[in-house]
A protein has these predicted regions:
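Glycine-rich loops and low-complexity Gly/Arg-rich segments
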Residues: 76, 96-98, 147
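Extended hydrophobic/aromatic segments used for targeting, binding, or gating
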Residues: 83-98
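Single conserved hydrophobic/aromatic residue that forms the stacking wall/gate
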Residues: 1-5, 9
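Alpha-helix initiation/capping motif
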Residues: 6, 49, 94-98
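Long, positively charged, glycine-interspersed low-complexity recognition regions
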Residues: 139-151
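Conserved amphipathic alpha-helical segments that form helical-bundle/coiled-coil interaction surfaces
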Residues: 10-86, 104-111, 119-133, 138
Length: 151
């Protein structure tokens, strides 16, 4: 199943946002990221987790300090909210998958807070690839060849 051009751009923008955020993260931003992460990791409510996941990615986009990147990612998140919510539900049902994604978020947040731009970009790429893998699994199970990666 091929990904659309928009999906490639979104992945690149997410990676660029992580890289820029690592260079711009203030102490307040670090506290906010850790707070969102703690809420995400402690919540067992899937709807709350989906909202917190979105909040984390949105916060990274804001910290990046590039309005164009933030606005494009925010618009994409609005358009793909249903797909992401379904993907998170699928991840929660799979053994250890939620733990894997939580660990990716944790490592990403720490790279951003520590200012490691290259590591933040790499970890965001890996995170996006993981989410894409789950979206493709869902599509294969449902026999839908039109579902493509969005986040």
């Amino acid at each position: 199943m091929s990904r659309g051009l928009g999906d490639v751009y979104k992945r690149q923008l997410e990676q660029e946002a992580a890289l820029l955020a690592a260079g711009n993260c203030t102490e307040k931003d670090a506290l906010d990221l850790r707070s969102i992460l703690a809420q995400l990791e402690s919540s067992e409510d899937e709807k709350a987790r989906a909202g917190l996941d979105k909040k984390l990615h949105t916060k990274i986009g804001r910290i990046a300090g590039n309005p164009m990147i933030y606005n494009v990612l925010d618009a994409a998140a609005q358009l793909t909210e249903e797909i992401i919510s379904g993907t998170r539900a699928y991840i929660m049902q799979k053994h250890n998958s939620a733990l894997e994604v939580d660990e990716q978020h944790r490592r990403l947040v720490e790279a951003i807070i520590s200012g490691d731009r290259n590591q933040a970009e790499k970890l965001m790429r890996e995170h996006m690839e993981t989410i894409e893998k789950y979206i493709l699994e869902i599509a294969q199970q449902q026999g839908e060849n039109s579902l493509v990666f969005h986040r």
